[in-house]
A protein has these predicted regions:
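Acidic/Gly/His-enriched mid-domain segments of enzyme catalytic cores or analogous surface patches
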Residues: 13, 30, 35, 47, ...
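Amphipathic coiled-coil/heptad-repeat helices and related helical stalk/stem segments
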Residues: 40, 62-65, 80, 104, ...
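Glycine-rich N-terminal segment of FAD-binding domains in flavoprotein oxidoreductases
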Residues: 56-69, 76-88
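Glycine-rich anion-binding loop/nest that anchors nucleotide
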Residues: 55-60, 159, 174-188, 224-226
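Active-site phosphate/oxyanion-binding loops
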Residues: 179-211
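Short, basic, glycine/proline-bearing loop/turn elements
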Residues: 49-55, 70, 145-152, 192, ...
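Short glycine-/acidic-enriched loop or helix-start segments at secondary-structure transitions
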Residues: 64-67, 88-89, 107-109, 129-130, ...
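N-terminal donor/sugar-recognition subdomains of glycan-related enzymes
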Residues: 1-53, 63-65, 194, 208-245
Length: 245
């Protein structure tokens, strides 16, 4: 079931970014046609439900966070697109990767080959990249619009905040954000190639506001190791081992 109130938030996104809903729906239909089977949610729930989950973004603080993250091998790591490269370069395999396929495709494929579950998001601007999803071993499709067929809607807008919405939807007891900075600097792993920085920052601001909205509805303990987010408790990386055992 889609999060209560999400449709209103989705309409805000369409209006604020001038997105074409027809293209959004078309993209979801194309992704649905590429997916051979519908990945069962219990495969994800086994990694998330009633567990402490790390959500890892590609913000500037990610690089300095990696030595701490490597200490928590047994905990589920849900990773936003670009951060996948940073983790794999440091011998950390994501459990789940949330991507709209604009990250480094070689590392996304490596994650899939290492048994990561790939959550591929369809939107109006990535239709030409959706065929990449065919090569992923374990793949679930998502949309911000109405779910159907093999396509789900857990909520969320950017890869980073979609990770949090996913963890919340599937019943994580504690969600800890790492590398989720939502600041004015873009991390080196955040996006491949040329992009519009102003639009990128606008998307990050929207993602942050969605997490603040989610925090008012979530039953999970919510923490961030980076810049403050309303509804999330701040915790230092050095104190994580006291919190998580």
């Amino acid at each position: 079931m889609t999060l209560n109130g999400w449709q209103e938030k989705y309409q805000e996104i369409l209006n604020e970014f001038n997105y074409n809903r027809v293209r959004e729906i078309r993209s979801a239909k194309i992704l649905n046609s590429f997916l051979k089977t519908r990945l069962q949610l219990n495969k994800l729930e086994r990694k998330i439900k009633n567990k402490t989950v790390f959500v890892i973004g590609a913000g500037p603080s990610l690089v300095s966070s990696l030595p701490y993250l490597k200490k928590f091998k047994k905990f589920t790591k849900i990773v936003a697109d670009g951060a996948t490269q940073a983790l794999i370069e440091n011998q950390v395999i994501p459990d789940i990767v949330v991507t709209d396929l604009d990250g480094n495709m070689a590392y996304l494929k490596k994650a899939s080959e290492s048994e990561s579950i790939m959550i591929v998001h369809a939107h109006g601007d990535n239709i030409n990249k959706l065929p990449y999803a065919i090569s992923f071993k374990y793949c679930l499709g998502t949309t911000e619009d109405k779910p159907f067929g093999k396509i789900r809607n857990f909520g969320g807008f950017t890869d980073g905040d979609r990770c949090v919405f996913l963890a919340n939807h599937l019943g994580a007891s504690r969600i800890i954000l790492i590398g989720m900075d939502f600041g004015t600097n873009i991390g080196k792993y955040s996006k491949e190639g040329i992009y519009n920085k102003d639009i990128k920052l606008k998307k990050l601001r929207k993602g942050k506001s969605l997490l603040e909205w989610l925090s008012s509805q979530s039953n999970a303990e919510l923490y961030t190791t980076s810049k403050p987010i309303s509804g999330f408790k701040n915790i230092r990386l050095a104190d994580l081992q006291k919190l998580v055992r």
